[in-house]
Regions:
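Alpha-helical transmembrane segments of multi-pass membrane proteins
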Residues: 1-245, 256-272, 280-283, 290, ...
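Glycine-centered tight beta-turn/hairpin loop motif at sheet-sheet or coil-to-beta transitions
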Residues: 247-249
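Short, surface-exposed charged micro-motifs
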Residues: 251-253
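Conserved S-adenosyl-L-methionine
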Residues: 322
Length: 322
């Protein structure tokens, strides 16, 4: 049984590259999802479980749909059209994602009494991430259809596709975490990987001399997303933050007024540490730790030796010296 591909798909390398960038983008979106959700729902094991679970559901459904579609209508135009839609959806996440999360939370907080965190995070994941990853889940079975030309070497071909997907996934795991998110933030990370998927599909349609309107429309939409979705401000309702950004480990937010400097990590509504400028108490549970220096008998604060496990921002050490 033999089947011939047309145009650029005659070169299996392009099919392998499609599998590579698809796998890379799936992992990049998964890691980006954790950073997008962390300021609102934290980065706990519960949230990670929800992210991984919903993405696996989306990929499984995409595999089933992609396999059936490839058998019924083995037209590569449809596959690369789906990749364009997935790319544009991912590019729209920085534009509207945080508003969707806040909207879902606002609705559920008044309608749900128990397990608000679990339900809100799950619904947000379903609405924002399931559809594009469902579309990317259709890539592998479709590429198997296009790349297997005969049954003599089909095992080798499928194995090579799997290897390219896995290598792409590995790169898509490390690059966002250690390179793009610390350097340019979560929003631009989404745009970078959306742009890669879009460029891949555009190359296909240009080489096939097809889908001209589709290509032009997708470029315009992507340009709009780049122009409006580059901001990494998760607390979009705040106008007086001293600092808001991301590190390798956390989302960071610093708020300062005449009385205090407060740092939040990974959550918008909690406080990691508070520094009081006027030697006052915070009124929070942190104040209990300030009693420790009083337990030392007849020893001035500038001569104290204090072992602090986890220095953090150094707030406690500074306060102890006072």
């Amino acid at each position: 049984m033999e089947r011939k591909n047309r145009g650029i798909l005659k070169n299996k390398l392009f099919l392998y590259l499609t599998e590579f960038f698809s796998g890379m983008s799936v992992m990049a979106v998964e890691l980006g999802a954790s950073r997008l959700l962390a300021p609102y729902f934290s980065s706990s094991q519960i949230v990670w479980t929800i992210i991984i679970g919903t993405i696996m559901i989306a990929m499984a459904l995409g595999n089933i749909y992609g396999g059936r579609t490839a058998d019924k209508s083995p037209n590569p135009d449809k596959l690369y059209g789906r990749i364009i839609v997935a790319a544009l959806w991912i590019a729209l996440i920085p534009v509207v994602g945080k508003y969707i999360i806040v909207g879902i939370s606002a609705v559920l907080i008044f309608s749900v009494n128990n397990n608000f965190l679990i339900l809100a995070a799950f619904v947000a994941c379903m609405v924002i991430f399931v559809f594009p990853l469902f579309l990317l889940g259709t890539v592998t079975p479709s590429l198997v259809k296009y790349s297997v030309s005969n049954l003599d070497d089909n095992g080798k071909t499928v194995g090579t596709l799997g290897a390219f997907n896995t290598i792409g996934s590995i790169i898509g795991t490390f690059v966002p975490t250690f390179v793009t998110i610390p350097a340019v933030g979560t929003s631009i990370t989404f745009l970078i990987f959306a742009g890669i998927l879009l460029a891949l599909s555009i190359v296909y349609f240009v080489m096939e001399k097809a889908g001209k309107k589709k290509v032009i429309a997708s470029v315009l939409i992507f340009a709009f997303c780049c122009g409006t979705g580059y901001s990494d401000s998760f607390a979009f309702w705040e106008n007086n933050l001293t600092y808001e950004g991301e590190s390798v480990y956390n989302y960071l937010q610093v708020y300062e007024n005449d009385e205090r400097v407060a740092l939040s990590t990974n959550v918008l509504f909690g406080v990691q540490s508070v520094y009081m400028k006027q030697d006052e108490l915070t009124g929070m549970y942190y104040d209990y730790a300030m009693a420790a220096p009083l337990m030392l008998k007849d020893k001035p604060t500038d001569q104290m030796d204090v072992l602090i496990l986890g220095m953090g921002t150094g707030t406690y050490a500074t306060q102890c010296r006072k």
